[in-house]
Amino acid sequence: MGNITKRGSRDLVADGATLVEESLATTLHSKLYEAIIKEDCNTIKTLLRNHPVNQPLTILANSTRYRLLSQQTQPIFPIHLAAEYRKPQSLLCLLQHGADPEVRDAQGFTTLHLMLLNWPASSTTWSKPSTQIQKILMDIQNNAVLCLCILCDHGAQVNARVDNSNKHSALHLAIIHGTYPVLSFLAQNGAQVNATNESSMTPLHMAADILNKNMIETLIAFGANVNCAISSTGNTALKLAVCTASSKVGRLLAAGVGCIRLLLNNGAQVNAQDHEGQTALHEACFGGREAIISLLLEFEANVNILTRNGESPIYMYLQRSSNIRDRSLLARLLYRTYPLRLSNKQGILPAGIMLPEYQLLRETLVKLSKKPLTLEAICKRSIRNVYGEKYKFHLEKLLPAKLWNSIYGIYDLTYLLKGEP
């Protein structure tokens, strides 16, 4: 019994010593945490004598300024703390004392990645702050930029990828989190604009997918490949932009025309096909948004390209009943299409014209598809497809008015379809 008592006493002493050590460590961590937040560089230097600069801090639940969205006891590296809270003086002090900018947290983020994840939102249009709130917002932005400059000046790897399943680069993160102002800075500091993530998407793919014209313009200016295709799907930036712009949200917001034109003006191949054989025009026709379809036609999109399943752009257009209501656009597409293929490889007609209310239209289109065109009509279609909308008025100056009207007159077909509901 006596031996048990003595051993228990020694255990109590050891436990007490451990508690004292933990208490001292907790106090040290809390003081260093507060010094970093307050940018008290003298205190930081003093505390780093007893705390390795690349050792994480563990902040307990009673710390007043810890991140609300994180677990209160989650460890954080001092340099990550300074970067997340945009404390340039603390960041510089830590780097000067040997902090490693490439140290990663439990999610695989480096200091630069965390800076981009926590970049302050910027929706201000004023150039000079006039209120206290504007001044605070401007100071926050300036501190973020200064921290970014300090990191890059101290060798932060701008092409390091996040160590997780996405493998995003800094440029990918900048686009995801809307940090447009840093794109050019990263590119100027060596960021690879054509780097791909785990999904084989480049930064341009991501910018096009969200229809951010400023980001697209910046990336192209720094050499982004506008025709790079995602390996898994074959989608290009143009196809992604058309898909988003043709969606319900894109239609409601009237978004994307500027982005698509920007891509086309910078060499995007309008007739590029994905792995299923779809072009941007197939996507646009399925969406049925007239502005997007017209823009692609202006840049000589081919209305006769078939997918691997034998579907033409007009087949995609006729898939949705909402598209069929726009008879003028339908007529324009029909007048460019030859031969008219209404069914796919399985012989299935588009779902839209299979509805009972479109029976007469379906019968009319089937007759048109089976009726061979005259040589004159084929020639007119060829001229329309070669010159397109882009050079149509230039052609008007060269041809007799009657001939030009016969080539570009589509009202007869519109009239033919007018009787449908």
Swiss-Prot record:
Say which domain of life the source belongs to: Eukaryota
Chain's gene name: Ankrd61
**Keyword Repeat appears in the UniProt entry:** yes
High-level lineage: Eukaryota, Metazoa, Chordata, Craniata, Vertebrata
**Has keyword Chloroplast?**
no
Against InterPro entries, the record matches this protein to:
Ankyrin_rpt, Ankyrin_rpt-contain_sf
Task: Give the record's GO CC terms.
Answer: nucleoplasm
Q: Name one Pfam family in it.
A: Ank
- Name the Gene3D superfamilies for this protein: Ankyrin repeat-containing domain
What's the protein name?
Ankyrin repeat domain-containing protein 61
Listed A to Z, the keywords are: ANK repeat, DNA-binding, Repeat
GO-annotated molecular function: DNA binding
ANK repeat boundaries on the chain? 27-57, 74-103, 107-146, 166-195, 199-228, 233-272, 276-305, 309-342
Q: Which cysteines are joined by disulfide bonds?
A: none
